[in-house]
Amino acid sequence: MIEYIRGIIEDIGPDHVIIDLMGIGIKIFVPFSTMKELPPKGNITKLYTYLYVREDGFQIFGFKRKEELELFEKLLSVSGVGPKGALSILSVVPIESFIKAVNSGDYKILTAAPGIGKKTAERIILELKDKVPKEVVVPKEDSLLNEALEALLALGYTKSEAIYALSDVNCESVEQAVKEALKKLAK
């Protein structure tokens, strides 16, 4: 329903972030993996979102990478796994480790997440074995952006400045990403 939200970070809580979107503060629950990639308060960020509707209200869950959102949605398809359980897994288990665990049947990795016991972990593996890729592929865009981030850091920009400058860059090459980011930083 809502593909993504781009706005200014107003506040960061232990499991959520408040994004100011044209004067409206939106509370978005995020996994730890997304939390550690967020720029500081006052900077712009973009999160891919999932709107969860319950009888007593709405909750929005956000992810820095689209692959995390897709995995979150797959976890919700498993009986007995709700949004908080799926978020717990994504907070503790990196995507690459999750995919390896599902493909190898290693439920112990999944039980590291709070609220996920042996039976739930085994059910996740059983139900998602045919739904996750056989091997982990780092998205090209992420690796390009990481290289561009390193280049901006080498040029003397702070990590928060570099992340902000690269937040909405669509790139085909590292050079192109750095050029677009430098233009944004020059404004």
From Swiss-Prot:
Record gene name: ruvA
Region Domain II, residue ranges: 65-136
One of the GO biological process terms: DNA recombination
Taxonomic source organism: Caldanaerobacter subterraneus subsp. tengcongensis (strain DSM 15242 / JCM 11007 / NBRC 100824 / MB4)
This protein's name: Holliday junction branch migration complex subunit RuvA
Main subcellular localisation: cytoplasm
Subunit relationships: Homotetramer. Forms an RuvA(8)-RuvB(12)-Holliday junction (HJ) complex. HJ DNA is sandwiched between 2 RuvA tetramers; dsDNA enters through RuvA and exits via RuvB. An RuvB hexamer assembles on each DNA strand where it exits the tetramer. Each RuvB hexamer is contacted by two RuvA subunits (via domain III) on 2 adjacent RuvB subunits; this complex drives branch migration. In the full resolvosome a probable DNA-RuvA(4)-RuvB(12)-RuvC(2) complex forms which resolves the HJ.
Cellular compartment(s): Cytoplasm
Free-text note on domains in this protein's UniProt record: Has three domains with a flexible linker between the domains II and III and assumes an 'L' shape. Domain III is highly mobile and contacts RuvB.
Function of the protein: The RuvA-RuvB-RuvC complex processes Holliday junction (HJ) DNA during genetic recombination and DNA repair, while the RuvA-RuvB complex plays an important role in the rescue of blocked DNA replication forks via replication fork reversal (RFR). RuvA specifically binds to HJ cruciform DNA, conferring on it an open structure. The RuvB hexamer acts as an ATP-dependent pump, pulling dsDNA into and through the RuvAB complex. HJ branch migration allows RuvC to scan DNA until it finds its consensus sequence, where it cleaves and resolves the cruciform DNA.
Annotated GO MF terms: ATP binding; four-way junction DNA binding; four-way junction helicase activity
Signal sequence coordinates: none
Residue numbers spanned by region Domain III: 140-187
Sequence segments annotated as region (Domain I): 1-64
Domain of life according to the entry: Bacteria
DNA damage listed as a keyword: yes
GO cellular component: a single term: Holliday junction resolvase complex
Keywords: Cytoplasm, DNA damage, DNA recombination, DNA repair, DNA-binding
Residue span of region Flexible linker: 136-139
Family: Belongs to the RuvA family.
